Amino acid sequence: MIRPQSYLNVADNTGARKVMCIRVLGGIQGQTANIGDVIIAVVKDALPNTGVKKSDIVRAVVVRTRKGIRRENGMFIRFEDNAAVVINKEGNPRGTRIFGPVARELRDRNFTKIVSLAPEVL
């Protein structure tokens, strides 16, 4: 569950390392985001000479949460960290690589490009 002021790791190679959620687009009553929800975030830590800089405002999709999600078959998926992937307005990732596993629920939310770039889909 990601709320405004929550920090997330960035799971792609855009150059951002940490982002802070400042707005949840959609989600549960517009207050909390789970896996597959789009958020607006501000870059808090970034590598130099890359596509995004510190204090840039970006859109991101949540790909991992410590809270986890329950699937219809009863399985419960939980990750070690909260992570997001920076996207553009069309919903495509701005980076060319995704680091770490992502949840299968992203495919249901039409983020197929992120799922295809991910090294592991759980």
Swiss-Prot record:
GO terms for molecular function: large ribosomal subunit rRNA binding; structural constituent of ribosome. It comes from the Eukaryota. Coiled coil: none annotated. PROSITE patterns: RIBOSOMAL_L14. It is found in: Plastid, Chloroplast. GO terms for cellular component: chloroplast; cytosolic large ribosomal subunit. Keywords: Chloroplast, Plastid, Ribonucleoprotein, Ribosomal protein, RNA-binding, rRNA-binding. Its main location: plastid. InterPro entries: Ribosomal_uL14, Ribosomal_uL14_bac-type, Ribosomal_uL14_CS, Ribosomal_uL14_sf. GO terms for biological process: translation. Part of the 50S ribosomal subunit. HAMAP family: Ribosomal_uL14. Binds to 23S rRNA. Belongs to the universal ribosomal protein uL14 family. PANTHER family: 50S/60S RIBOSOMAL PROTEIN L14/L23 (PTHR11761), LARGE RIBOSOMAL SUBUNIT PROTEIN UL14M (PTHR11761:SF3). This is Large ribosomal subunit protein uL14c. It comes from Stigeoclonium helveticum (Green alga). The lineage of its organism: Eukaryota, Viridiplantae, Chlorophyta, core chlorophytes, Chlorophyceae.
